[in-house]
């Protein structure tokens, strides 16, 4: 699959915007890729083809390794939605500008993205009965992960009750750890193995 120079440029521009929002400095190199800096010190590079490149000397501390991993996570998410934005159809509804693209559509819910100078903005809407309009928008600005989760719940792909908050996950972990480390329950070896895998 060939990606045009314009698509690569839009991808790198979006990555630069998102990285800046997350506290990283990024600038273009003479080769057209992005150079990412942390505290004004080179951290890694982002080639036009996606992914990241780095020198081991630039990620020599746990903090810099974590920062490199965060950049990689950001770049993967940006690549995912920019690939979709480049190929997605325009959302055609009455009274809405043509800059929104349909990223996902299931049941009566649509997930759309709209490019802006602040990065791609995401929204989920309910379709009207005749699919000529949308309503009840949930706006996520640049938060792609939350927009995807909202779409999955609103469209019925998953039930909200199947998701846990970070606080709930902490308590589940604590209870599992207490169950196997304490003498609260008589557990079989198989039950203990399953709980430890959590």
Please state what every model-predicted region is.
Residues 1-24:
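Short Lys/Arg-enriched alpha/beta "domain-start" segment
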Residues 27, 80-121, 163:
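Short N-terminal "domain-start" leader segments
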Residues 32-38:
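A cross-family detector of function-defining hotspots
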Residues 38-81:
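Long, continuous compositionally biased terminal/linker segments
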Residues 48, 112-137, 172, 178:
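Short aromatic-glycine-(Arg/Gly/Cys) micro-motifs in beta-strand/loop hairpins
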Residues 59, 131-145, 159-161:
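A short, exposed loop/beta-hairpin motif centered on an aromatic-Gly-Thr core
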Residues 71-82, 143-159:
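Short, structured interface segments
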Residues 160-198:
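Charged/polar low-complexity intrinsically disordered segments, enriched in acidic residues
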């Amino acid at each position: 699959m060939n990606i045009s120079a314009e698509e690569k440029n839009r991808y790198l521009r979006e990555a630069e915007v998102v990285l800046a929002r997350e506290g990283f400095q990024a600038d273009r190199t003479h080769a057209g890729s992005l150079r990412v800096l942390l505290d004004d010190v080179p951290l890694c590079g982002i080639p036009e083809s996606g992914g990241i490149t780095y020198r081991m000397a630039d990620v020599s501390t746990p903090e810099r390794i974590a920062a490199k991993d965060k950049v990689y996570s950001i770049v993967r998410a940006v690549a995912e939605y920019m690939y979709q934005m480049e190929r997605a159809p325009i959302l055609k509804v009455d009274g809405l500008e043509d800059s929104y693209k349909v990223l996902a559509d299931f049941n009566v819910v649509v997930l759309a993205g709209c490019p802006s100078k602040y990065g791609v903005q995401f929204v989920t809407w309910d379709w009207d009965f005749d699919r000529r309009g949308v309503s009840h928008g949930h706006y996520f600005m640049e938060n792609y992960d939350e927009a995807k989760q909202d779409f999955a719940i609103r469209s019925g792909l998953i039930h909200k009750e199947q998701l846990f908050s970070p606080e709930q996950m902490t308590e589940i972990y604590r209870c599992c750890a207490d169950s196997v480390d304490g003498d609260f329950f008589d557990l079989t070896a198989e039950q203990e193995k399953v709980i430890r895998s959590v």
